[in-house]
Amino acid sequence: LSVNIPKMKSDLARYGIQYDQWFFESSLHESGYVADTVAALTDKGYTYEKDGALWLKTSQILAENLRRAGKSDEAIEKLGLKDDVLRRANGFYTYFAADIAYHRNKFAVRGFDKVINIWGADHHGHVARLKGAMDALGLDGAHRLDIVLMQLVKLVQDGEVVRMSKRTGKAVSLTDLLDMVPVDACRYFFNAKPETQMEFDLGLAVREDSEN
């Protein structure tokens, strides 16, 4: 973290972004706030134990919300809702448990009236689950938590998609992109249609003619 966070801050500064506060997930575990949040869900009757793990009744929470929204039991059944593990059999809490605690902290401790998250579209399946967990805690996630999904971007160079792979470590970072394309062009391309999957044409971004 001591190496990566300063690099992140430097890269974001080049893009024109500065965060006012950095929050460490580890602080939630060290303070016992994750355990306290899970205990709060248990006190409200929204957890159960199975196979040595502690589970959140996600399917029940979401079904209750959907019924209030007018969905029929038949329609809800077709969704195949599933429950989520909060604490594994080995005693370690899941990322989802920490995520619930983090958002509970924003509402219940830091006093946020509204929280807006910006996520990649590949996390769309997590939206209803997190909102539901806030509802289960009495924090009105349906109205106080907004989640904006940003689509993924394909980089195109000389008419070919630039192939990237997590497995092989082949990637183009933001700072790599800013070495090739002016920051204003990057910001324009990314903000033009954030809700739509797009191709970022590196050649077009630096071209100075009527097509750009």
Residue ranges of model-derived segments:
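Conserved alpha/beta enzyme-core scaffolds, especially Rossmann-like or related mixed alpha/beta domains
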Residues: 1-51, 106-120, 143-151, 197-211
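Short, internal active-site loops enriched in acidic
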Residues: 27-30, 60-63, 153-155
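A contiguous, basic/glycine-rich beta-loop/short-helix subdomain that forms a polymer-engagement track
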Residues: 33-108, 134
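Well-ordered alpha-helical segments embedded in enzymatic catalytic cores
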Residues: 7, 98-102, 129
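Alpha-helix N-cap/helix-start motif at coil-to-helix transitions, marked by capping-box chemistry
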Residues: 2, 6, 94, 179-180
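Catalytic adenosine-cofactor/nucleotide-binding cores of aminoacyl-tRNA synthetases and other
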Residues: 103, 107-212
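Short, electropositive, low-hydrophobicity segments enriched in small/polar residues
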Residues: 20, 56, 95, 124, ...
